[in-house]
Amino acid sequence: MIPILLTATVNPQGMKGANFDVSERIEMYKDALKFYAEKGLKVVFAENSGFINLSQLHSDMSRMANRDSQSIKDCFDYKNMEFVDVSGPEYDQSRGKGYNETILLHKAVNASKFVQEAGCFFKITGRLKVLNIEKLLEEISKLSLSSSLSFAADCKDHKVYEWLHMPINGHVGECRYWFASVEFFETMMWPRYDELNDYPPNICLAEDLMLDVCRNTRGLPGCRDRFRTQARISGKGGHNLGKGWSFFYSTDNDSLALKVKCGLRQVLRWVMPWWKV
């Protein structure tokens, strides 16, 4: 079973642009953990701020299961949940989320028993719920049967907005969810962590780096930069984009605008899988 690796920062410690306070974040993480646990998936929860007792979180999850109906409680298998503390002096809020999350991933990949046993992982931003996660994992499993899959992600890489003279970036990697073998991550992604910085003057966002990885591996055996399945995500986004273009920049993944976009993109993945919109 491919383990889900949930990345978590309970306390961003004043990181510029980070949304939600500590109590809100904790509740979001608990909600996401419960969602994936109920599906019987293998889950690795990795936290890098050191602001929460992971043993206590585990106990809280147990109480949550006991409080719910028996049918829900029976879905929880705590043998399939692993809590990893990856806090340390490397955390640097002055570099932003991409830099710190990549360090988190490197430490978690090496510390997690589940990931080491599987040799791969499916990364998800820990506050979010990928509602059709089973479909994405099924797609990865099928690809792995036909070839040795080492990397699968999503990206936007088109010139539509440029043609329409719209001030929107049509070239960006998807960092909220992706799949990688341990070897791929350690050799193709981790060595570039020090390039990452969310702030001027040397901006390199995680989305920029992911797009570069997608482009560099496009067409290579075992690498995919487009899922056939459109991920359906629930939860609030952690960015401050705004710009008044709610259809393009909404931070609410449950909004009507993003649900419409999600539906349109699924159709395009079926009929024009080569068009990365």
Description of each model-found segment:
Residues M1-V277:
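ER/Golgi luminal nucleotide-sugar-dependent glycosyltransferases, focusing on the catalytic module
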